[in-house]
């Protein structure tokens, strides 16, 4: 009985911490969703300051991008696909991490991202993992199928 009482007391003591973590995770998920819906889907690049830390880093292959470089890349994507729509399919959070599974689609009507304008419709799924610090997006890792994008744009031959 005594052990059960101690266990119950310990469990009750931990509940506020678990509730706080759950609240932070939900807040972080909402920040990530708002970033995708407002910045990437609607092109409201001024909203970066609302969601991202000033010392943000995007880990992109062989180059870590600063906040300014990440904003420039997002603007370049919007330039190449002016009608781009970005849909959040799924969001999962654990501790200070938020994973977003998304779909982007649009028409490549202007040169951008190193590609000429092709007039073709493009659709791609991707995954982004954010790390949060002090309520802001502090780090990002993103992956998507660039080969599929190039094939849809007619810039790379389809498989034989």
Language-model features: locations:
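Exposed beta-sheet edge and beta->alpha loop/turn motif
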Residues: 106-134
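Hydrophobic pocket/interface hotspot
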Residues: 32, 44-49, 56, 70, ...
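Short, low-complexity N-terminal intrinsically disordered segments enriched in polar/charged residues
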Residues: 17-50, 54-55, 156-160
């Amino acid at each position: 009985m005594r052990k059960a009482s101690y266990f119950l007391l310990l469990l009750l003591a931990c509940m506020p911490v678990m509730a706080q973590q759950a609240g932070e995770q939900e807040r972080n998920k909402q920040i990530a969703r708002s970033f995708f819906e407002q910045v990437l889907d609607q092109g409201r690049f001024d909203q970066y300051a609302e969601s991202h830390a000033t010392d943000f880093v995007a880990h992109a292959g062989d180059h870590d991008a600063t906040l300014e470089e990440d904003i420039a890349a997002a603007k370049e994507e919007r330039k190449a696909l002016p009608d781009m729509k970005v849909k959040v399919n799924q969001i999962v959070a654990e501790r200070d991490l938020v994973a977003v599974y998304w779909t982007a689609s649009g028409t490549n009507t202007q040169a951008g991202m190193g590609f000429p304008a092709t007039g073709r419709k493009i659709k791609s799924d991707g995954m982004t993992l954010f790390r949060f610090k002090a309520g802001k997006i502090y780090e990002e890792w993103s992956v998507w199928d660039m080969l599929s994008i190039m094939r849809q744009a007619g810039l790379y031959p389809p498989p034989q």
